[in-house]
Amino acid sequence: MALHLGIITLLPEIIQGIHYGVTGRAIEQGLVKIDCWNPRDWSSRPYKQVDDKPYGGGPGMVIMYEPLHAAIKHARSEMKENCKTIYLSPQGKVVRQNDLKQIAAQKQSLLFVAGRYEGIDERIISHHVDEEWSLGDFVLSGGELAAMVFIDAIIRLIPGSLGHLGSAVQDSFMNGLLDCPHYTRPATINGLDVPDVLLGGNHKEIERWRRKQSLGKTWLKRPDLLEKVQLSETDKQLLAEFKCEHGDSC
């Protein structure tokens, strides 16, 4: 059965990009079903207005409770009963790969609420949102792009969505580390060579090299991740070799 994903958005046109690439193929294969609902369709105000000035004053506009609540209620009625409603905002918990794996494993319908303007009426968040997530400590013009990023990351974890079964497993962060470097033909170009070990055909040595590079890249670029990973004695040896090769103390 297809995973049902929904998006509440004032700009459904933005979401069309999700029908291309990996996510688009997953939709075509019937692995995922994606629907959008526009709160303007439930607005009773002139010109389908869905925003109003914030109580207490201040800049910007706030998306009103009534049309947004009606859109959420309608969307949930068309999705599975165990549908989870997610609001994407800078105030949410920053999502990590492990969070995405847990969410994907639940195989639960997900309804994403994409905010705009100064945000949405707080009563929606407190009474009609199950989880609040953020992509990081920065602000976007709306939640549509964040929802698409979230959905793309979820779809990659669905079996059959990628061309190779090992692609998602090898992604950065899947095992707590950054991915190893990748090369393709030609073996030499502009004086730059592919590492010999990748050309030799010794799969055991290739696996060892990739693990060492993964550990090393994590040490160079995201050392904070190493503090959260339990390294084996072999991992520690490989990391020590990498550090020595890159001018660190041997």
Curated annotation (Swiss-Prot):
Keywords from the UniProt entry: Cytoplasm, Methyltransferase, S-adenosyl-L-methionine, Transferase, tRNA processing
EC number: 2.1.1.228
Entry GO CC: cytosol
Enzyme class label: transferase
Cell compartments where the protein resides: Cytoplasm
Pfam family, one: tRNA_m1G_MT
Reaction(s) catalysed by this chain's protein: guanosine(37) in tRNA + S-adenosyl-L-methionine = N(1)-methylguanosine(37) in tRNA + S-adenosyl-L-homocysteine + H(+)
Gene3D superfamilies: 3.40.1280.10, tRNA(m1g37)methyltransferase, domain 2
The organism's place on the tree of life at top rank: Bacteria
GO molecular function, one term: tRNA (guanine(37)-N1)-methyltransferase activity
Function: Specifically methylates guanosine-37 in various tRNAs.
The family this protein is said to belong to: Belongs to the RNA methyltransferase TrmD family.
NCBIfam families associated with the record: PRK00026.1 (NF000648), trmD (TIGR00088)
Subunit comment: Homodimer.
The protein's name in its UniProt record: tRNA (guanine-N(1)-)-methyltransferase
Annotated organism of origin: Legionella pneumophila (strain Lens)
